[in-house]
């Protein structure tokens, strides 16, 4: 049984508490409980009427004369009543389903309560951050003394300025061609983008993930199963006059990959590493990161995705963020792990971690990775179940999890700020060099300012 319906029937207090912690009204839970009660009562009534109809059908065969005419008349009346009751049952079922689908995922008990992203809770710091001497006090206050750091006398040029000053990207011409938040990556940054992708895929393949290049477009039916589409529609691009939408992340087509399937227990978990471009309108981001390549309409990303048994999902949530940490430790970029609070969580996830990289030019941590356990929120909508074997009764809905591995343009911004030298060169993380060495024209040790190439 779907966890939200199970809670409605067996333990509604879980839903009440989840809604309260999210800062949302509990009225939707009351409505679901009432509709479910009415639906079950109507189902009982329909079954009783069907039973009576069957009894009368048998009685018609045995009755004779005037008695038979009376039985036929009653049978017709009951049949009409069955029809009306079935229509009412269908109406109640549709209304109940609509209400249930509007209830956000049940929040895990470890999610901190908070109103917005300012109340997300850092739970771990890694690496020694390079902190400009004027930013030290703010850094110590921000990290509450939990993070290591080294003081620097020179503040790096911010990534947004660096990519243009050193000729690594052309945003002005991209704006002329496609509008704001687009870019042309040039030469060394193109190679770096490729190397980051190969690094993440190579790592995940060694962890037994199946590498997937998914469709870059999805139908509305599939998209509605992976996200709250009415809220998400303003974020994605629609193909005009087609029932197709450009994907915002490979998570979405991979989540829908097993739509309307029953998976065997023995084949779970299914581990996928998706690689794709991502297309986002960035609605609601007006005024945020308007320069550079940090917040853009199109970017490349490697994504982790897991289908697993319900009892495995919390273990896998920790494993996915562990994979991410290994990748970012390999890059040598200081970061922190943040437990996302209730007000910033969104309705799909039961719990989410973010990995935020230290950006020395901005003197702040910035989001690079989101890692979510969606439990059975997506699988119920997509009708992805599990059973002991195919053909045997379903035991329930699988759990789905997703996590960024590396979003390449964001990773590039972190590399530029953390490994920038005074002469403008940027040291390439050692773990990426083996993916560049076989290519004669690719940079090997440093990204060079264009004038020095």
Curated annotation (Swiss-Prot):
Q: Could you tell me which InterPro entries the record lists for this protein?
A: aa-tRNA-synt_IIb, aa-tRNA-synth_II, aa-tRNA-synth_II/BPL/LPL, Ser-tRNA-ligase_type_1, Ser-tRNA-synth_1_N, SerRS_1_N_sf, SerRS_core, tRNA-bd_arm
Q: A cellular component term (GO) from this record?
A: cytoplasm
Gene Ontology molecular function terms on file: ATP binding; serine-tRNA ligase activity
UniProt keyword annotations, A-Z: Aminoacyl-tRNA synthetase, ATP-binding, Cytoplasm, Ligase, Nucleotide-binding, Protein biosynthesis
Show the catalytic activity.
tRNA(Ser) + L-serine + ATP = L-seryl-tRNA(Ser) + AMP + diphosphate + H(+); tRNA(Sec) + L-serine + ATP = L-seryl-tRNA(Sec) + AMP + diphosphate + H(+)
Tell me the Gene Ontology biological-process terms attached to this UniProt entry.
Answer: selenocysteine biosynthetic process; seryl-tRNA aminoacylation
Q: Domain remarks in the entry?
A: Consists of two distinct domains, a catalytic core and a N-terminal extension that is involved in tRNA binding.
Q: Which family does it belong to?
A: Belongs to the class-II aminoacyl-tRNA synthetase family. Type-1 seryl-tRNA synthetase subfamily.
> What protein am I looking at?
Serine--tRNA ligase
């Amino acid at each position: 049984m779907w966890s939200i319906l199970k809670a409605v029937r067996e333990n509604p207090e879980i839903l009440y508490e989840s809604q309260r912690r999210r800062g949302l009204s509990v009225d939707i839970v009351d409505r679901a409980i009432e509709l479910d009660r009415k639906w079950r009562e109507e189902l009982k009534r329909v079954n009783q009427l069907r039973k009576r109809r069957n009894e009368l059908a048998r009685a018609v065969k045995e009755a004779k004369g005037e008695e038979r005419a009376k039985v036929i008349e009653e049978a017709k009346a009951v049949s009409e009543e069955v029809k009306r009751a079935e229509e009412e049952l269908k109406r109640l079922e549709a209304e109940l389903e609509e209400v249930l689908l509007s209830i956000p995922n049940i929040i895990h008990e470890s999610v901190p309560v908070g109103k917005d992203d300012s109340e997300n809770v850092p739970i771990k710091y890694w690496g020694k951050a390079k902190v400009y001497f004027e930013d030290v006090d703010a850094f110590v206050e921000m990290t509450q003394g939990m993070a290591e750091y080294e003081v620097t006398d020179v503040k790096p040029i911010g990534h947004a300025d660096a990519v243009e000053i050193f000729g690594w990207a052309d945003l002005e011409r991209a704006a002329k061609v496609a509008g704001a938040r687009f870019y042309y990556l040039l030469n060394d940054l193109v190679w770096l983008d490729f190397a980051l992708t190969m690094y993440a895929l190579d790592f995940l393949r060694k962890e037994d993930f199946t590498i997937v290049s998914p469709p870059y477009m999805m139908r509305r039916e599939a998209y509605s199963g992976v996200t709250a589409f009415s809220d998400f529609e303003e974020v994605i691009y629609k193909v005009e006059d087609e029932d197709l939408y450009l994907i915002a992340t490979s998570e979405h087509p991979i989540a829908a990959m097993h739509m309307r399937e029953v998976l065997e227990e023995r084949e779970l978990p299914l581990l996928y590493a998706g690689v794709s471009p991502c297309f986002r309108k960035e609605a609601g981001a007006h005024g945020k990161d308007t320069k550079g390549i940090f917040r853009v309409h199109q970017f490349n990303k490697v994504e982790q995705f897991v289908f697993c048994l319900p009892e495995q999902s919390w273990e896998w949530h920790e494993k996915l963020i562990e994979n991410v940490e290994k990748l970012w430790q390999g890059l040598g970029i200081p970061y922190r792990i943040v437990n996302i609070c209730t007000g910033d969580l969104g309705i799909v996830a039961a719990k989410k971690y973010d990995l935020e990289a230290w950006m020395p030019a901005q003197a702040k941590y910035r989001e690079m990775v989101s890692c979510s356990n969606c439990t059975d929120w997506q699988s119920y909508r997509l009708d992805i179940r599990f059973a002991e074997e195919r053909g045997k009764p379903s035991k329930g809905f699988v759990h789905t999890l997703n996590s960024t591995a590396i979003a390449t343009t964001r990773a590039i911004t972190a590399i530029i700020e953390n490994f920038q030298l005074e002469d403008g060169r940027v040291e390439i993380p050692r773990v990426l060099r083996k993916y560049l060495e076989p290519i004669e024209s690719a940079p090997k040790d440093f990204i060079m300012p264009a004038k020095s190439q």
